[in-house]
Curated annotation (Swiss-Prot):
Keywords: 4Fe-4S, Cell inner membrane, Cell membrane, Electron transport, Iron, Iron-sulfur, Membrane, Metal-binding, Repeat, Translocase, Transport. This is Ion-translocating oxidoreductase complex subunit B. [4Fe-4S] cluster 1 binds at C49, C52, C57, C74. PANTHER family: ION-TRANSLOCATING OXIDOREDUCTASE COMPLEX SUBUNIT B. [4Fe-4S] cluster 3 binds at C127, C147, C150, C153. NCBIfam families: PRK05113.1, rnfB. It comes from Escherichia coli (strain K12). GO terms for biological process: electron transport chain. It comes from the Bacteria. Its main location: membrane. Its cofactor is [4Fe-4S] cluster. InterPro entries: 4Fe-4S_dom (IPR007202), 4Fe4S_Fe-S-bd (IPR017896), 4Fe4S_Fe_S_CS (IPR017900), 4Fe4S_Ferredoxin_RnfB (IPR050395), Elect_transpt_cplx_RnfB/RsxB (IPR010207), RnfB/RsxB_Proteobac (IPR016463). PROSITE patterns: 4FE4S (PS51656), 4FE4S_FER_1 (PS00198), 4FE4S_FER_2 (PS51379). The gene is rsxB.
Amino acid sequence: MNAIWIAVAAVSLLGLAFGAILGYASRRFAVEDDPVVEKIDEILPQSQCGQCGYPGCRPYAEAISCNGEKINRCAPGGEAVMLKIAELLNVEPQPLDGEAQEITPARMVAVIDENNCIGCTKCIQACPVDAIVGATRAMHTVMSDLCTGCNLCVDPCPTHCISLQPVAETPDSWKWDLNTIPVRIIPVEHHA
C-alpha cells in the first residue's frame, strides 16, 4: 500500500513540475498576434470556403493586413464585409472582385437530389458552414439560408446528386435600394 502512495506522489510531483515548466514557457515564448489581423478575421464570415484564393479566413486576413491583398475577394461576405474592412483600414471601398463587375452574379445554393442521395455524409464533412443536415444512410438536405454556394460539397459526392442552382429572386431575397424609392414627406401639425 505504501508503494502505491509513493507512485501517486511521484506522478503528482512530475505533473506539477511539467505544468509549471509549460506555464513558464507559454508566457516566456508567447507570440503576439497582429491586432489588425484579429479585427479583420472577426469581420470575415468564417466560412473557410477558399473562394478568395486562400485556404481560410485567417490566411486571407493576414494577407490583407501584411501583404496588401485586395479587400474585395470574400464572396460569401460580399459588399457588407468589404465595406467594414475598408472602414477599419481607412481605405477606399473597391468593387467586388471581378475587376469591373457590372452585374452581380446570382447567389448560388447547393441542392441535393434526395432520390439519388445514398447518405454517405461526405458532403456534410466537406461543408465549411454546416449547411447540410442528415444522417448516415439517410436522406440529406441543404439549409439554403446557411449555404454560401462555395461548391465544396459537389466534388466529394459519389453519386453526383448535388448541384449548385441560383436562388430565385423574391421580394424577400431581393436587395432593395431604398435610396431610389421616391418618398414624399408630409408635414404633420400637432394640435394641443
